[in-house]
């Protein structure tokens, strides 16, 4: 759980948004976090996600807890990861 902090870029591993990248916006409790794509960027809507269904990456952006989608897009532009977020990750197996 400690790897999933606000601003961490993750990959969804289950559900209809499987293999899409998302960003942790808020920590709800020990089992759930609030994530967003943003939707217009990766297709991931702002929603609650189980931490067991996320794979944390080494990348993170500097955002405040509960940041808006516009703030997140701005932070991604600043570090040059905007285009990288659009690409889905293929399963390694």
Tell where the protein language model's regions lie, with residue ranges.
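Short, charged beta-turn/beta-strand-edge "cap" motif at the junction between a beta-strand
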Residues: 15-18
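Ferredoxin-like alpha/beta domains used as RNA- or RNAP-binding modules
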Residues: 1-6, 13, 23-93
């Amino acid at each position: 759980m400690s790897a999933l902090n606000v601003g961490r870029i993750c990959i969804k591993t289950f559900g209809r948004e499987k293999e899409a990248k998302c960003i942790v916006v808020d920590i709800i409790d020990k089992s759930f976090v609030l994530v967003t794509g943003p939707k217009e960027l990766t297709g991931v809507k702002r929603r609650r996600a189980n931490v067991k269904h996320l794979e944390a990456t080494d990348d993170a952006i500097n955002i405040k807890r509960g940041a808006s989608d516009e703030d997140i897009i701005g932070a991604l532009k600043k570090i040059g990861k905007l285009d990288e977020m659009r690409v889905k990750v293929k399963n390694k197996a």
